[in-house]
Amino acid sequence: MEKIKPTLNGAAETMLQSFYARAKYSKSKNCKFYDAKAVEIVDKLDYDFDDAHSDSTMGNGVIARSIVLDELVGDFIKKNPDCVVVNIACGLDTRFYRMDNGRITWYNLDLPETIEVRDQIYNEHGRVSTICASAFDPSWPEKVTVRGKMLFVIEGLSMYLTAEENAKMLSIIRDNFDNAYVIMECLAKKWVNKEDLEKSIQKTGAKFVFGADSFDDLGDVAKGFEKVKDDNITRGMVKIYPILKPFQNLPLINKAAQKMLIFRKK
């Protein structure tokens, strides 16, 4: 099979770094997280992953957030087995294949250049399908089946958007879905403008421009929503490195960790 050569840049290119991190870790001994699809597909891509391979800061963060997000999404699906999930800025994410209970409906939404790569690799249809659109396109909800409680997963995106852009993205969800629940990954505020700490991300040209330490920090960005829970990826890091467990609940550690903010439409 001829390898697929992705042509991406900036924030869109960061999806390749995250994808590689999941594949690399899944091949490691005694891994606490396994992404079978990433392992299967990584060698089909014609892309220089050297920077991602050596960027342990980025890699550990990706695995920790994957562990915690799998837990959060899995819990939602367990409570709502016929739910609809919209994965915004999906990149090459494979969570559907780990979460599928045979009943959920799952949409992977991203920009045209990303969906083009994704469609070549996955050829998704049926209960899992793609939506080729910007998260700011007010028409994308027309392509989504509305049924019961709706979960919107926003991973690896908010930190690359301005507050105004994040507000616009969330307003589209708010204005179109009455039973909307959102899990939104946010950069801790102390890391805004510090993308140089993740060398593979820095080399894509993407910038960390937005962060929030809690739902309350979102303010008008999440207008029309109410808090369900503030969470973070600390326990994911502890699963990777159990030696960190004694420090898990230290305020300083929790403040610096990537946040998982869970909220719903009022």
Where are these regions (language model features)?
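A conserved beta-strand element that flanks and buttresses the S-adenosyl-L-methionine
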Residues: 152-153
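Short, glycine-/aromatic-enriched active-site segment of Class I SAM-dependent methyltransferases
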Residues: 189-206
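Rossmann-like AdoMet
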Residues: 1-86, 90-133, 146-147
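A short, conserved alpha-helix within the catalytic core of class I
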Residues: 160-173
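Short alpha-helix
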Residues: 206-233
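Short amphipathic alpha-helix with an adjacent loop that forms part of the alpha/beta core around
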Residues: 138-147
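Core SAM-dependent methyltransferase catalytic element
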Residues: 236, 240-266
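Conserved beta-strand signature within the Rossmann-like core of class I S-adenosyl-L-methionine
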Residues: 176-189
